[in-house]
Design a protein with these regions (language model features):
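N-terminal "domain-start" segment
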Residues: 2-99, 110
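Acidic, glycine-rich flexible loop segments
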Residues: 94-127
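Compact beta-sheet-dominated globular domain cores
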Residues: 114-150
Length: 150
């Protein structure tokens, strides 16, 4: 009887470990989510250029039916390695790392009062430095952008 309980407990532990491993394998890491939400390199061509933000936010599952519209989102049109390189830069007083050079990006800002889809955005093309927070040497959050010093 005791052996049966030990075997059952061992089997349950193995199943729990297997499920945890599978969940991690199919789950999205914070870095993967950062890439999905913020990196568009090379810049995606959209037939209606003025609809770039709506198209990309829906395609990248940032906005979706039943979820509130995201007030702002930025797509960086540079290789992911350039944003990873920012993590090796000295952090600022707030703990954010900045890209050493300005890069092309599209800043999307929600227009009107819609808080639920359909979401309508204003797009601005900019050349800005990008501020990120990093974990394990990888960017996981886009904290903001700023214009190069003149």
């Amino acid at each position: 009887m005791a052996l049966g309980k030990v075997l059952m407990a061992g089997w349950a532990l193995c199943m729990a470990l297997l499920l945890a491993t599978l969940a991690g394998a199919v789950g999205e890491t914070r870095y993967d989510k950062f890439l999905r939400q913020h990196v568009d390199y090379p810049r995606t061509f959209t037939l209606a250029a003025h609809r770039y933000c709506e198209t990309m936010l829906a395609r990248r599952r940032v906005t979706a039916p039943g979820r509130p519209c995201k007030p702002t989102n930025t797509f960086v049109h540079a290789p992911a390695r350039d944003l990873v390189a920012a993590c090796s830069q000295m952090p600022d007083a707030e703990g954010f790392h900045s890209t050493p050079t300005a890069m092309g990006l599209t800043a999307c800002r929600l227009r009107g009062g819609n808080t639920r889809p359909p979401c309508t955005y204003q797009a601005r093309q900019l050349q800005h430095h990008v501020r990120v927070s990093c974990v394990g040497g990888l960017p996981v959050h886009l904290a903001g952008t700023y214009a190069p010093l003149q």
